[in-house]
Design a protein with these regions (language model features):
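Small-residue (G/A/S/T)-rich helix-start motifs and N-terminal tracts that mark the onset
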Residues: 1-146, 150-172
Length: 172
């Protein structure tokens, strides 16, 4: 590796429309909950995840979503992953896709306040097309992770159609 010889204050002075969210910023957004508050008061998220052989990604991301504080979580998975997810994350609402092994049909998103898509999703062409249909015109905050980002890597001409309220979580 070679040092590219940037001055130490370059990052602080460089203009960019992008930024990295730090832990302190997130902690300041978390509000304390009342002891007997209803779960419905803390939002309903949709997680579209998993494909055949990748059920673990949907399980881990569902647990992480619940730990983040969402009140209700619906996880949309291929039919083949239903029983495994329902057994390992019983507090999640499990919804199945029309396909046995991968995401192939967009989901109605009217009742959700946030959507995440990508963990273990796979990159089948049907999945890529369904994902693009799903995210276009998405009216709520959207998190793209893992295979959702990889799909944009193989369909670079779709980048211009990425929604504005979109958070990317790449593996660096």
């Amino acid at each position: 590796l070679l040092d590219i010889q940037l001055k130490k204050d370059f990052i602080d002075t460089a203009q960019s429309p992008y930024y990295i969210t730090e832990e302190e910023e997130i902690r300041s957004l978390i509000k304390p909950r009342k002891r007997f508050a209803h779960k419905g008061a803390f939002g309903h998220a949709l997680l579209i995840a998993g494909s055949y052989g990748m059920a673990g990604a949907s399980i881990l991301s569902a647990r992480a979503c619940l730990r983040s504080g969402v009140g209700l979580l619906t996880v949309h998975v291929p039919i083949h992953n239903h029983d495994l997810l329902q057994t390992t994350v019983p507090e999640a609402i499990v919804q199945t896709d029309i396909h046995d092994h991968y995401f192939a049909e967009p989901v109605d998103t009217d009742r959700y306040q946030a959507i995440a898509i990508g963990p273990g999703l796979g990159q089948e062409e049907d999945t890529a097309l369904a994902m693009m249909e799903q995210i276009q015109g998405c009216p709520v905050p959207l998190v793209l992770d893992a295979d959702a980002i990889n799909i944009f890597g193989t369909h670079r001409n779709w980048l211009s159609r990425m929604p504005k309220r979109c958070i990317l979580t790449p593996h660096l």
